[in-house]
Regions:
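Feature activates predominantly on carbohydrate-active enzymes
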Residues: 1-146, 157-169
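Conserved Class I S-adenosyl-L-methionine
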Residues: 152-154
Length: 170
């Protein structure tokens, strides 16, 4: 089974009984007010295991979400991004890049999602150029500083469900 099985079941009920679409927030869906929502006697929610163990997305250009505050909260649009991912059967997310990745890791984890990292942030570490803007980003020259950033990234996420990204593309 899945640790998120109950969550997926709740979202299935919200779709099939309440009629709430998976992307309700993104298309300004307003539910119809009803006195009751009858549940058919033969109603069942069954699931089959996903064929792919880890399913998720990278929220690219996430800085565009910052301007979309809802309820006067920068976090609310992120909650809706992560809810949409869960509604679609996802279980893993790269919660942004640079400062945003650290800012929204806990929210994603609290919602039951695995965390992984942008290719420029191995082990979820702060980008070398951000931490040391005046130094050459060279492991040969500053290996100790890279290792310290990686260790800090691991320490910050040790209690989260993480799929560790070890590489850097290119």
């Amino acid at each position: 089974g899945s640790d998120l099985g109950f969550v997926y079941g709740v979202y299935e009920i919200s779709r099939s009984i309440l009629g709430i679409p998976d992307f309700w927030f993104w298309n300004d869906y307003m539910p119809e007010k009803k006195e009751s929502y009858p549940i058919p006697e033969d109603y069942r929610v069954e699931s089959v295991p996903f064929k792919i163990a880890l399913r998720g997305w990278f929220v690219n250009d996430e800085v565009l979400l910052k301007a979309w505050e809802d309820d006067y909260s920068e976090e609310k649009p992120w909650e809706m991004v992560l809810e949409a991912l869960l509604r679609c059967g996802g279980n893993m997310v790269i919660p942004g890049t640079d400062k945003n990745s650290r800012k929204y890791r806990k929210l994603a984890s609290d919602m039951g999602l695995y965390i992984t990292h942008h290719h420029a942030e191995p082990l979820g570490a702060e980008m070398f150029a951000r931490a040391y803007p005046k130094l050459e980003a060279s492991y040969d020259v500053h290996g100790d500083k890279f290792r310290a950033l990686w260790e800090e990234g691991i320490e910050q996420q040790k209690d989260l469900n993480v799929v560790w990204n070890l590489g850097f593309r290119g």
